Amino acid sequence: MEISLLQAFALGIIAFIAGLDMFNGLTHMHRPVVLGPLVGLVLGDLHTGILTGGTLELVWMGLAPLAGAQPPNVIIGTIVGTAFAITTGVKPDVAVGVAVPFAVAVQMGITFLFSVMSGVMSRCDLATNPRRI
């Protein structure tokens, strides 16, 4: 099965909304148990989406960002893992082997981005100082 451009766009919108939820709303739409069925619905295989989302939820159930430790990015991991399971027809436990490396790699990128942005924030604070004008 191939993913159409419209389906890829819909998955991107789902990832965007889930990312907003993860950092702002915390309605838990970013959890795999919710994202898996949504990906399955978009790709036309709700059953595999539910099974893969549930399996990935078991993998990431107890992970929480505490202090400086950041867990793998569950959003990208779930979307990539579920899409992989649906498009290739593999079992959900095989999708875990694909989802986890993607989740770790994306979280490393996000941590790097946040580290770079921390240096920019002091410059932004200086630029908004009204006495500087």
Swiss-Prot record:
Chain segments annotated as transmembrane: 3-23, 33-53, 66-86, 94-114
Localization terms from the record: Cell inner membrane
Protein name in the entry: Putative N-acetylgalactosamine permease IIC component 2
Record-linked PROSITE patterns: PTS_EIIC_TYPE_4
Lineage: Bacteria, Pseudomonadati, Pseudomonadota, Gammaproteobacteria, Enterobacterales
Disulfide bonds: none
Domains as described in the record: The EIIC domain forms the PTS system translocation channel and contains the specific substrate-binding site.
Biological process annotations from GO: phosphoenolpyruvate-dependent sugar phosphotransferase system
